[in-house]
Design a protein with these regions (language model features):
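Internal helix-loop-helix
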Residues: 2-102, 148, 154
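FAD-binding core of flavoproteins
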Residues: 109-197
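A short, Trp-centered hydrophobic/proline-enriched beta-strand micro-motif
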Residues: 99-112
Length: 197
């Protein structure tokens, strides 16, 4: 994770971009790709970080989620006259201002894989909405393999599979501070913890 910040200082032409929202230089992991050159530089940066660290640097899922959400929220707003895109841009701008790390929480624990989320015996095997009010939505459930979230400032939660109409409470994408009340992390030893470098 630290190397993603260091590379932005050592090689700004590779690991930074200009924010269209703040006008300032930002970490490329927070940048929304605007053209094929941006995509090329994202890939080149990831390759460089892989060479420098020899491991996961824990920011790719968050970057990919932001790029997807930029398009999807716009398309949803166009179709349904909602304001998800404006809300997303406000959040993205805050992330740009403070150079924060976004983790992506996509993988659900799934339970019985032959069943959709609403068909599971245990409702908490997938993340779902349990309450809504003027402040937002409240979620409950589980995600798996979220090592990067432990080292992030925020996590973007999203479904991992196609959902049916009966799964609408599970159709949630949102950002949660990683230290929010009620979140429990279970972290185990990794298979490569003792490997020689």
């Amino acid at each position: 994770m630290a190397e993603t910040y260091d590379l932005a200082v050592k090689e700004p032409e590779l690991a930074t971009a200009k924010s269209p929202y703040t006008g300032e230089s930002i970490n490329r992991f927070l940048h929304i790709a605007e053209n094929k050159e941006d995509l090329f530089l994202q890939n080149k940066m990831q390759r460089k970080l892989g060479q420098l660290t020899g491991t996961c640097f824990q920011r790719c899922v968050g970057m990919d989620a932001f790029n997807a959400l930029h398009s999807v929220t716009f398309e949803i707003d166009e179709k349904y006259k909602t304001n998800y895109h404006d809300n997303f841009i406000k959040f993205l701008t805050e992330m740009h201002k403070y150079n924060l790390v976004i983790g992506g929480a996509m993988t659900d624990v799934k339970g019985d894989r032959s069943k959709l989320p609403h068909e599971q015996e245990d409702e908490d095997l997938y993340l779902r909405i349990v309450d809504r009010n003027e402040k937002g939505v409240y979620v409950k459930g589980a995600k798996a393999h979220q090592t990067g979230c432990i080292n992030s400032h925020w996590m973007v939660v999203m479904p991992t599979l196609r959902l049916s109409e009966n799964d609408k409470d599970y159709a949630i994408v949102g950002a949660i501070p990683v230290d929010a009340e009620g979140i429990t992390y279970i972290y185990g030893r990794q298979s490569c913890d003792t490997r020689s470098m």
